[in-house]
Amino acid sequence: METVAAAITKNNGYESFCVTNAKNNNMKVNSADPLNWGVAAEAMKGSHLDEVKRMVEEYRKPVVRLGGETLTISQVAAIAAHDHGVKVELSESARAGVKASSDWVMESMNKGTDSYGVTTGFGATSHRRTKQGGALQKELIRFLNAGIFGNGTESSHTLPHTATRAAMLVRINTLLQGYSGIRFEILEAITKLINNNVTPCLLRGTITASGDLVPLSYIAGLLTGRPNSKAHGTSGEILNAKEAFQSAEINDGFFELQPKEGLALVNGTAVGSGLASIVLFEANILAVLSEVLSAIFAEVMQGKPEFTDHLTHKLKHHPGQIEAAAIMEHILDGSAYVKAAKKLHEMDPLQKPKQDRYALRTSPQWLGPLIEVIRFSTKSIEREINSVNDNPLIDVSRNKALHGGNFQGTPIGVSMDNTRLALASIGKLLFAQFSELVNDFYNNGLPSNLSASRNPSLDYGFKGSEIAMASYCSELQYLANPVTTHVQSAEQHNQDVNSLGLISSRKTYEAIEILQLMSSTFLIALCQAVDLRHLEENLKNSVKNIVSQVAKRTLTTGVNGELHPSRFCEKDLLRVVDREHVFAYIDDPCSATYPLMQKLRQVLVDHALVNGESEKNLNTSIFQKIATFEDELKTLLPKEVESTRAAYESGNPTVPNKINGCRSYPLYRFVRQELGTGLLTGEKVISPGEECDKLFTAICQGKIIDPLLQCLGDWNGAPLPIS
């Protein structure tokens, strides 16, 4: 009996979703796993992070070798994104199978066999008959060219360049399996279009039911030289069909379609699944990013790290949650922020909340199921891009054409709807965390709006960014509404149920872009918070030094040099500095209306009240020392605060930045050093949006991947032991 693991065949080092008979290249049923559930389960083994690392490694390879069974979403994303460099190679071993199905169609037609789409009309009009097979294919492409370019208008209704390249790759992969009845030379021509960066213009208008008929017909139109065909050249210029062929180095002229070939080109789900592949590559990266951002959020918010304890998550059983918690635990383990926060939490514990708010404390429980959804969708789309989606299917071994419905793109529509829901929920978490971060009622001492200027009345920090985040989140949540519940009966009620796969993919692509906007804004805010914690530590250090100096100078001795009762106040005065949030008073540290001076005075008053009879003696009265202490503090403290700020701004702070020794440092370094962003203040000209723009562009270009993975480079794939 063959095991499930053995059922996953290997090709070029990648797992195949098909089990093949090497002798005749026909599908066979695996007796150990006849329904493919075992193969699906096997594909989910290992951690999500390891899978993302494999995806990134695969994405960066210079060649994609197509054989019909081992295409991955990362390969699709690579071809889609890399206009130059990554090349497609076709497996020569597939040529014989492709030719056999093509020959079968011609022989069948010559014998007078009645076959759908070869001798019949299409869809609801399949009762019509013709013997003009080539003319029928030509008409198929003509009537499916029903899209609208919108020439002369501001809006363009062509699909993105990346989506078209992805669609061409996926369609080639499907056709290579030899069940479609098309010449190998046509697949080679499409490959040349990809490799020479010539991209047909595809239009909207598909319900992904009998495949993506309308957009795919524009690829067929270009291959056959239709006069309305357009393509983008290597520099983005618009080309007609003849120019496109010249640019792609296709030298044999336009194709005269043989029977079934037009149908083979258009009757597939490649546009929806191609775009879905691009979406899911990005979604997987954003999912890992959200885990690391949540950990950094816990660091700058001085959160309690016990929310990542493995026992909590082990008892919940969900693998996505367990992994999310373990990743956050890894980031927080040994973090200087966590160590400092622990000391703060031990100070007056009964006067502080026992636990953090949900956006921090339940982030693993929130993200875990979303990661599972994205991962399952990834595997579903990976199966789809390795599927044969034609109708009819040409079964050469049994000498028959099978009429079915593999063109129904339900796996795409459902996977994309689910992915969009997951993206919206990730966005909601980031927004909740962002809202806590900028609110001084919740953020454990950071300034309101993360303002960093000397004068908070002229610096409103991330207030505009919070409004933008609310806008992004609202739009993202609107997009989370399902597409697949909006099916309309089409094509004379023949296509009465249809998947809407491409529409759902397009909406999910929009959701990806919005989540990238949110992730960019949030990470810039987190870096601002990191720098503010650094500034806070330096300022507090300076305030403590000055308070200590002034206390020693003014409170230790009396007028005649004798030891004074007020000498015992210093410890309590420094405790006030430790307890007070620096940014609550630092813009005017000696103001009588701010908490620092009020509470320092209260310490002296409290000591005076217990000084008893000694207060009646001017030489031993603590009350008499208060004015002297405050006057000297007012003289020294503002100067020291300004000096500390100046040293910080010049890059010479007394206390180094804690982030430098943390596992989250690679992301911070990337944002600050590689992208050249800095601490935002109202005193500077640069706006928050300009800094967010730099990071957004970097995320879209994939530049954040390496620093993100570096944060987790030494994670062993397991939670810390329960101790």
From Swiss-Prot:
Metal-binding among the record's keywords? no
Q: Which Gene3D superfamilies match?
A: Fumarase/aspartase (Central domain) (1.20.200.10), Fumarase/aspartase (N-terminal domain) (1.10.275.10), Phenylalanine ammonia-lyase 1, domain 3 (1.10.274.20)
Which residues are annotated as active site?
Y116
GO molecular function per UniProt: phenylalanine ammonia-lyase activity
Pfam name, any one: Lyase_aromatic
Which tissue types show expression of this protein?
Present at high levels in roots, with slightly higher amounts in roots with nodules than those without, and at moderate levels in stems. Low levels also present in lower leaves.
Q: Which UniProt keywords apply?
A: Cytoplasm, Lyase, Phenylalanine catabolism, Phenylpropanoid metabolism
User: What would be one Gene Ontology cellular-component term for the protein?
Assistant: cytoplasm
Residue positions annotated to bind (E)-cinnamate are N267, Q355, R361, N391, K463, E491, N494
| Sequence position, cross-link 5-imidazolinone (Ala-Gly) | A209-G211
Q: What is this protein called?
A: Phenylalanine ammonia-lyase 1
